[in-house]
Amino acid sequence: ASSAASDVYKRQVILSAGAINSPQILQISGIGPADILKKNGIKIMHDLYGVGKNLKDHYNVRLTGRVKNISTINEQPRGMPLIKEIIKYFWNGNSILSLGPTLVYCFWHSDETIKNHDLQMTFTPASYPEGNQAGLDTEPGFSIAAWQQRPESLGWVTIKSSDPFEKPIIQPNYLSAPEDQRVAVEGIR
């Protein structure tokens, strides 16, 4: 006798839910490190140590500054300037509403001896409150950011419970590798 679960299990399945959700789905489905599955009361379908391991993410260092006597995007999405931008957008499509989040990109070497670029730099004529990129600062400002393109630091993702709606624990271990620290400092310079 076969069940729907075993029929699905026998087929090849491609799971593509991203670096965070893929290990979470696998772990709550019983595929992952046995100790994590047992701790969360999940039946072990396949003890696979690497599920949730080796998380790599592009850490960025963002620098912001204030400007005087010049307008930036910060002032545009409020009050009458916002209404003007909405009208411009619907009139001809040219407005701050048609801009991407970053206006200038460049790729850079943190060290002249490196063959491939290992830094991405960005510039935006806007600034955001610390720890938040959902809203703009109220004063005129700009942002410059540097991202390491090939991080070496390894993190992990693990479930907190068997509840698929509970967010997993994410430990990116940013800057834990000395090379990542060096590249971040060079990006700031």
Task: Annotate the PLM regions.
Residues 1-5, 9:
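Single conserved hydrophobic/aromatic residue that forms the stacking wall/gate
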Residues 2, 19, 30, 60:
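ATP/adenylate-binding site constellation spanning eukaryotic-like Ser/Thr protein kinases
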Residues 12, 23, 33-137:
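Mid-to-C-terminal "cap/lid" subdomains and adjacent gly/pro-rich loops that border
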Residues 104-189:
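C-terminal catalytic lobe of FAD-dependent flavoproteins
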Residues 31, 56, 60, 68, ...:
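Short capping/connector residues at structural and topological boundaries
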Residues 10-28:
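Short hydrophobic core segments
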Residues 15-16, 46, 158:
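Structural recognition of the beta-strand scaffold that forms the well-ordered cores
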